[in-house]
């Protein structure tokens, strides 16, 4: 297996110095020989090295540097003189592209190209320049580089100033390289089947049949009486839920938060001018039902709002326990089940209102939101029409509902109840991988695993991306806490798991954590 990472250990830096010597002293006579057979680059402290491995053997490298002057500036003058102005906003230099002689194959080239482009793109560079040797001109062109200035150097070591622009990457290389990518995102979900129903009207009888079938399936999975299907995101679903609380003027509520999405609910509730208190727990810790019972016992609260599956930490809050408290103290329980709905079987029977979406565990295209209720909502003239739950419960389809979304959801729902077992098995398989012992100590649900990275693994997120393994860690709330998330809901999970397991197996032999 060939795989790439950002160099970070002393052993890697020594291997880089050896390869640097073999390539740029012995093979290409740029520097004087020495007895150590090591060549440390003059910009070593400023370089970021991407290295390529064959299992655990370092076989190739490339260096990035964005501090001026570039070495190519010293050869031809400032590169901006030769490049179009629009590509000069953020330029980096790529140097020291080297691969051991025995490994100069198309597979290694492709792996380095993928890693090089991913790194440059993620860092926001508009162009990457390189001094390419004339003997490897074909190789550089295969990687997307184009000559932009006359050749320079000596007869024995002649170089071509070459550039790879962000525009070339986006319009030529990105799609080709992304074919080998696997994602472990908790949404959106990759679609492998052709999207149909592109010409079906939402006013047709055929559409109505699909709509009713989807409604019944959702109601069966949720064990509720009513569901509104809305074009929108989970945020829209929660707006509709909160709008009901505001329109009904139910009184004071209690909002429970122990993560990012509980906090978002609280902020939305503030915008609706709802009257409520907050029970705030540390991220990743579950709520103490005894303490909540003491609060409800006062009789001060008429409703309670909680996130069932707190995606930011992978915490599954105790829905059964909270439901029992709500019933006992006659409090209306409202639940954000966006992350858990479709991931495991549970009942929303005792929930006054609950929300879910199409593009999470269910595995359908993102774009449809669901609001479940145990009652038939009354029209609320004070609410915006789009956020009035009653409009979605009158039997008619009040607003345009794309058939492509509904048809895709219908097909995804046909996987139930078998999908529950599939996700559980995937979840258990994921737990066996290296580094999963770093998962947060919390109550889990079979949708995603959250690990907290020690300093030694600070590059793991980008290192996985360099190899086409895309995991969830870009959100600010995840970056701030060093969280990395692996979800099990993508259609090609089994194939992705094999590659992830293989890479992590070698990775842990290089990086101790």
Features from the language model and the residues they span:
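Active-site C-terminal subdomain of aminotransferase-like
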Residues: 359-431
